């Protein structure tokens, strides 16, 4: 029997949630591949991708879950929140309804996620300034009220996309992992569970391929 080699030191499950059409899939595509697709079809159910970061000679594997925003997929997508220790909750700055629905998404995540987690509130499509329906101040106030980080991004022109993901992971690393041992129950499609032990972490230094800023509520 051949044993599989674990190709990472730490595993971090992050979900990207929010209404349909706010740009979740393009945010992930821009972060992972620096690509943007005009007219990209809405996600059906859940899509999955990974990204590995090298920090202090440790490999950090991110599981990035892109969840559908349509109501009919709720029963499917909520099951994938289990074990998540991070979330990007996304709204469209040019769509008031997507902002009004943030409470719903936040509640669903907190009911299903790991007991310790970090959340980044993302006001996407900042390139649509002339059509803005949600002010930057409103986004900041919502984030502060619910103890989240906040940033405005544009998947179209890539503004702040990498910063949004990296600041979230930075917050998780320093606030949840640093000098603390915790076991993460990673649920893989509801079939296989693996326990990843995280502990005794030192302050991180990303290699030259990645930029990390200390977590802040106002980062744009």
From Swiss-Prot:
Disruption outcome: Mutants exhibit normal growth and development, and endocytosis and the structure of membrane-bound organelles is unaffected.
Family: Belongs to the small GTPase superfamily. Rab family.
Lipidation (S-geranylgeranyl cysteine): 219-220
GO biological process: hypotonic response; intracellular protein transport; small GTPase-mediated signal transduction
Keywords, ordered alphabetically: Cell membrane, GTP-binding, Lipoprotein, Membrane, Nucleotide-binding, Prenylation, Protein transport, Transport
A Gene Ontology term for the protein's cellular component: plasma membrane
Keyword Nucleotide-binding set for record: yes
Organism whose genome encodes this protein: Dictyostelium discoideum (Social amoeba)
Main location: membrane
Keyword Protein transport part of the UniProt annotation: yes
Protein name: Ras-related protein Rab-11B
UniProt-annotated binding residues for GTP: 18-25, 66-70, 124-127
Membrane-topology descriptor: Lipid-anchor
Pfam family, one: Ras
Subcellular location: Cell membrane
One Gene Ontology molecular-function label: GTP binding
Motif stretch (Effector region): 40-48
